[in-house]
């Protein structure tokens, strides 16, 4: 690639940014850097650069940062790229998940599988395969070091280009059931790549300056943004090291086909590009899918009758369907053999946060002010990104990432029954925030009955003859219509009490989402006499299945957990 002299390059970029800001309509560019001029964005501390070349290589380039969160336990290994840049990451399949959390997630998943695509609540992740365990983001600390040579650098600015910390296997082990794969064609194959989905001259300019700094320092670590089909790359990983799609599909297949996961369903979404059809690569995508997943277990578009409701997940699994594949692009007849078009599935929506708390549960910043209570059973998949490029956010704009799916927002999202919340940087702690049925650290008793008591929205194990409890009854035609029985009964009589209600369409049941659980709790607190202490839930069978069985090991079978002092390998 032809390289322009640094001074000419910086002037050219400054002129581009000045023109960009001058032509913008509406509010001026936000400037948290308090620059005197937009040109100052690209001013470098050149004297410092000249002094720091040797020191940079010692303190930054050759450093091996530990990128495993402090509260995560796993097998730590040293992951290096082909240039010798390394970081400490978690080995595939070794992230520990507490037993209570594994069981709580499995319980909620069993309940969710009773609902269909349009109403089930199952955790997802954003850009699932752009993860640190597979090398995405390993070079970030080098580019973060380059930031120090910008005149406006402030302590705390980061370069963070991986969406996830852990492998696909670990995400699945943590309860994720919606996987997003960013698929692009370059270097003669389909790869997992975070390619330019938006146009940001600010990001393009920063990448160019990063590469000029690399030349001045003599590090040889430049941002690969020139790959055909992937320009710019939004990750610091070299294009030739971005993972082949086949490897990701193989990993998903290995997990799904393990005997202990025979009762699980997986949703896979390809965030792909229309060029795959133009380049005649859709057939290759389908061939890769069929190589790792038997066609008989794939739910395919022609197998559904669209004028009827979507089947429940448990119904699909009973007939051997275990996985569904969706695409962000309509490939017409080329893709319809296997791929559902995302936008045609349950009026799919990806609204931005914030989300108003229960009972409103509306995405107030969405254009249509949509929300869970609309009862049109739309799939809501909010996704948020925590990628950072110094002073640029995940959208390549000046500013920070706001309204994130994290430990603070996810409990409210769970209470509203949002279908597929898909955050960045999923961890066991972040998954804890999605639990609505069981209190932290608590395990239910598989030999007892289950009730929702006044003192908490989480469930309790109680004696099956506990007095002063009403049955929770749901409309068989509408899982969001809940009422309570007329009078207290023992648990064994709850089904008859619901069937005796005047409507004739009510049955004794159990909430399948945080939203349904909140509806039942609201009935208890607002409509039941004060003498009623709680509500029977038809959950004994599910609780018995989950809490009477052994859960998976905290890490992958056969993998012990050790500190980096004990295990230091290169993957």
What is each of the regions a protein language model found here?
Residues 319, 329-571:
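Extracellular, disulfide-bonded carbohydrate-recognition/adhesion ectodomains
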Residues 305:
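SF2 helicase/translocase NTPase motor core
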Residues 26-178, 185-269, 273-276, 280-284, ...:
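Long, acidic (Asp/Glu-rich), low-complexity accessory segments flanking structured domains
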Residues 293-302, 323:
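Charged/polar low-complexity intrinsically disordered regions
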Residues 173, 257-258, 290, 294, ...:
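Sec-exported extracytoplasmic/periplasmic mature domains
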Residues 6-26:
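Cleavable N-terminal signal peptides of Sec/SRP-targeted secreted and luminal proteins
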Residues 55, 247, 251, 284, ...:
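Acidic, Ser/Thr-rich intrinsically disordered and amphipathic helical segments
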């Amino acid at each position: 690639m032809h390289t322009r002299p640094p001074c000419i390059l910086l002037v050219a970029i400054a002129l581009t940014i000045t023109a960009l800001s001058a032509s913008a309509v509406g509010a001026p560019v936000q400037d948290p850097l308090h620059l005197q001029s937009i040109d100052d964005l690209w001013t470098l501390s050149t004297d410092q650069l000249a002094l720091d070349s040797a020191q940079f290589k010692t303190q930054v380039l050759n450093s091996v940062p530990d990128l495993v969160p402090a509260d995560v336990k796993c097998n730590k290994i040293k992951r290096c790229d082909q240039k010798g840049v390394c970081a400490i990451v978690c080995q595939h399949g070794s992230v520990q998940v507490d037993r209570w959390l594994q069981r709580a997630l499995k319980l909620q998943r069993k309940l969710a599988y009773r609902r269909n695509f349009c109403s089930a609540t199952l955790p997802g992740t954003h850009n699932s395969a752009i993860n640190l365990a597979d090398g995405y983001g390993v070079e970030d600390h080098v580019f973060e070091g380059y930031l120090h040579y910008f005149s406006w650098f402030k302590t705390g600015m980061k370069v963070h280009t991986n969406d996830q910390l852990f492998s696909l296997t670990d995400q699945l082990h943590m309860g994720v059931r919606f996987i997003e794969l960013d698929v692009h064609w370059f270097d003669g194959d389909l790869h997992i790549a975070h390619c330019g989905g938006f146009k940001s001259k600010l990001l393009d300019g920063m990448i160019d300056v990063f590469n000029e700094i690399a030349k001045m320092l003599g590090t040889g670590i430049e941002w690969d943004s020139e790959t055909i089909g992937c320009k710019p790359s939004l990750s610091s990983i070299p294009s030739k090291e971005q993972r082949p799609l086949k490897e990701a599909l193989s990993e998903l297949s290995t997990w799904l086909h393990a005997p202990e996961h025979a009762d699980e369903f997986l949703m896979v979404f390809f965030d792909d590009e229309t060029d795959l059809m133009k380049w005649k690569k859709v057939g290759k995508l389908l061939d890769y899918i069929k190589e790792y997943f038997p066609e008989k277990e794939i739910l395919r578009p022609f197998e559904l009758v669209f004028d009827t409701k979507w089947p429940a997940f448990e119904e699909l699994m009973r007939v051997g369907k275990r996985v569904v594949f969706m695409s962000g692009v309509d490939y017409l007849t080329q893709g319809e053999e296997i791929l559902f078009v995302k936008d045609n599935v349950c009026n799919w929506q990806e609204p931005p946060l914030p989300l108003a708390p229960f009972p409103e549960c509306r995405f107030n910043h969405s254009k249509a002010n949509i929300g869970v209570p609309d009862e049109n059973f739309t799939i809501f998949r909010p996704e948020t990104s925590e990628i950072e490029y110094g002073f640029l956010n995940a959208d390549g704009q000046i500013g920070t990432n706001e309204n994130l799916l994290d430990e603070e927002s996810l409990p409210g999202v769970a209470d509203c029954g949002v279908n597929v919340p898909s955050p960045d940087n999923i961890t066991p702690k972040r998954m804890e925030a999605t639990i609505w049925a069981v209190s932290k650290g608590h395990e239910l008793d598989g030999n007892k009955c289950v009730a929702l008591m006044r003192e908490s929205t989480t469930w309790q194990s109680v004696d099956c003859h506990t007095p002063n409890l009403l049955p929770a009854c749901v409309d068989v035609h509408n899982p969001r219509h809940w009422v309570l029985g007329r009078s207290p009964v023992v648990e064994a009589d709850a089904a008859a009490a619901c069937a005796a209600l005047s409507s004739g369409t009510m049955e004794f049941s159990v909430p399948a989402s945080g939203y349904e659980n909140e509806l039942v709790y609201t009935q208890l607190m607002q409509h039941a006499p004060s003498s009623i202490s709680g509500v029977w839930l038809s959950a004994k069978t599910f609780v018995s299945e989950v809490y009477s069985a052994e859960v998976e090991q905290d890490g992958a079978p056969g993998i012990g957990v050790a500190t980096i002092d004990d295990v230091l390998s290169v993957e």
